[in-house]
Design a protein with these regions (language model features):
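Short, glycine/acidic-enriched capping/hinge loops at junctions between secondary-structure elements
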Residues: 13-15, 54-57, 220, 278
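Membrane helical hairpin/interfacial module
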Residues: 41-59
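Conserved "HGTGT" condensation-loop signature of ketosynthase/thiolase-family condensing enzymes
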Residues: 1-44, 65, 69, 132-239, ...
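A short, Trp-centered hydrophobic/proline-enriched beta-strand micro-motif
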Residues: 73-75
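Claisen-condensing/thiolase-fold acyl-transfer catalytic domains that form or cleave C-C bonds
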Residues: 21, 25-28, 49-51, 63, ...
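Conserved beta-strand-centric core segments of catalytic alpha/beta enzyme folds
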Residues: 1-18, 86-149, 249-284
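Surface-exposed loop/turn positions
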Residues: 41, 70-71, 122, 263
């Protein structure tokens, strides 16, 4: 069995201009409290706003907490980043070669201009073989990969390197064609969640969706076709935090008592790419 020993999120409701590895430092210190950092086997960081092109944000984080025995690498999976990090950490621990792996996500939105609807946030979870009250039962994800032009950063990669003109035109910032694309993706994500749960014979007591805007949240909730009291809604008006989104919502639901004991919880993520992800936990 694989467990989440502790999960802590941080939602800033602003752009902090903090490096990603600094932004997630507080949640990480909270989830490893009382633990020797040398016992951390790995750090997986989901982010598209890492401190440097290289080294990785996870490497920077590992240095700050002195996790000298840990492997470290970053992943990019947009809005489903935290669940993707969980999936990898789960696999490492399930292999029984590793006992403690940090799955973190941190987004610091220096790559946005002010009109974009994003706020800084971070989340950390300690994935472990040590029995805890949150058991990871199931994780799945899928990617379409055909929607590049709808939400991406146009400049800065091999296809379009940095240019003076491009920077003036803000092509190094996140580009979103239309917020309505996420409203439609929310419907598709709800269908994916229902089909995946049905196929695997999983019954859910409580759903925690990622958030982008109120409209996309409502579309997800309505398309899921379950009692609205079974859906965590306290983040529905919050700005998105990309890969940290679902993890922050999960952490808040744990802290505010929305998740009841002896319940089966579905953490749902969706976004650009297009990516969809689902994690199921038993909370005792």
């Amino acid at each position: 069995m694989v467990y989440i020993k502790s999960c802590k999120g941080l939602y800033k409701n602003e752009k902090t201009k903090m490096p990603a590895s600094d932004l997630v430092l507080e949640p990480v210190k909270e989830v490893i409290k009382g633990m020797d950092a040398l016992d951390i086997d790995g750090i997986i960081c989901a982010t598209i706003t890492k401190d440097y092109v290289y080294p990785s944000a996870s490497c920077m984080l590992g240095g700050k907490i002195k996790a000298k025995n840990a492997f470290c690498y970053d992943i990019e999976s947009d809005f489903t980043g935290f669940i993707s990090a969980l999936r990898l950490a789960y696999s490492f621990v399930e292999s029984k070669r590793y006992k403690n792996v940090l799955a973190v996500s941190s987004e610091s939105f220096y790559i946005c201009d002010d009109k974009d609807r994003f706020n800084d946030a971070s989340v950390a979870a300690l994935i472990t073989s040590e029995k805890s009250n949150i058991q990871i039962d199931f994780i799945d994800s899928t990617t379409d990969g055909s929607a590049l032009e709808n939400c991406y950063i146009p400049m800065g990669g091999a296809v379009k390197p940095y240019t003076r003109e491009g920077i003036i035109n803000k092509e190094h910032f996140i580009y979103i064609k239309d917020n309505k694309i996420f409203e439609e993706e929310a419907k598709k994500s709800a269908l994916y969640v229902k089909e995946t749960l049905s196929k695997n014979n999983i019954e859910i007591d409580y759903y925690i969706p990622s958030y982008f805007n109120k409209e996309s949240f409502d579309n997800f909730a309505n398309s899921l076709s379950v009692d609205k009291n079974k859906i965590y809604s306290k983040m529905e008006n919050s700005n998105s935090s990309l890969s940290a989104t679902s993890g922050v919502a999960f952490s808040m639901a744990l802290e505010d008592g929305s998740i009841k004991n002896n319940s089966k919880v579905a953490l749902c993520g969706f976004g650009s790419g297009y990516t969809k992800a689902l994690a199921v936990f038993s909370v005792s």
